[in-house]
């Protein structure tokens, strides 16, 4: 069993946190919005509301004690970059960042993300591939 800190509870973060917990891993889910935290609280090991841009919040959550942190917070480069940077400076062994563009990807890599994912782009590619293979009747 590994321990994961999932920051940002949009569609991707919520889905990931719930899936990791279902697989038997320890999951701490964090979001700035209390309502998102409440929605996922019953499906993960721990859930907390807090501003992950603040290193003191990350320290209080025990961020450095997790095996991996996944940053899916913020649609802008600055927010996710700051969170990734804070996590790396706190000593989190593996930090995964979610990017929305090639530039976002480069920024997260440059500041130390161990891995960067493009969930929206990967979903779009999968949908295009499926549409090319499956012809749905019009009607």
Residue ranges and their predicted role:
Residues 1-139:
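Cytosolic regulatory regions of ion transport systems
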């Amino acid at each position: 069993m590994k321990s994961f800190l999932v920051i940002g509870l949009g569609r991707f973060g919520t889905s990931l946190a719930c899936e990791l917990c279902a697989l038997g891993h320890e999951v701490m889910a964090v979001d700035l919005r209390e309502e998102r935290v409440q929605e996922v609280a019953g499906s993960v090991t721990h859930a907390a509301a807090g501003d992950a841009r603040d290193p003191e919040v990350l320290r209080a959550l025990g961020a450095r004690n997790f095996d991996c942190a996944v940053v899916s917070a913020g649609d802008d480069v600055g927010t996710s970059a700051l969170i990734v940077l804070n996590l790396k400076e706190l000593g989190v062994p593996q930090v995964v960042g979610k990017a929305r563009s090639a530039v976002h990807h480069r920024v997260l890599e440059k500041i130390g993300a161990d891995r960067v994912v493009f969930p929206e782009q990967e979903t779009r590619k999968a949908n295009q591939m499926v549409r090319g293979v499956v012809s749905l009747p019009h009607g």
